[in-house]
Amino acid sequence: VAVEHNAQVYRRQLQELDTSMAADFDSIAPQRRKLVTNHHVLGYLAQRFGFTVIGAIVPSGTTLAAPSPSDLESLVAAIETARVPAIFVDSSQPEKLARVLSEQADIDVQIVPLYSESLSPPGTPGSTYLDMMRSNTDSIVNGLR
């Protein structure tokens, strides 16, 4: 009975989170709903909330792969063409390549950390799934507005 009750409570919290995220993301103009990440981690979020994934610094599904110089040049061009205001990087990964792309782009591009590979320590933003998603939502909204 307790497990069933806790499952219902958590399901309700997830539904409230989804509603809140949708409302927050709706505050971003459609032409600014463009994502560039350090690797492909936001595809489901993009599909669910109406974002376009412009590209990823590491073009494969693993962080062990290294992008080629032509991959990076193509991504810089895509960032400039789409006028992407932010590159979202995992808070637990180095942001060196994102910084290089930001500096090479002929537009202002900020680097915004997200929680995607792991949760943060207890008591900090991103320490639970719900907190992680709230924190990421705030970061995405602030990065794209």
Give short role names for the model-derived ranges:
Residues 1-145:
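Extracytoplasmic metal-acquisition and chelation regions
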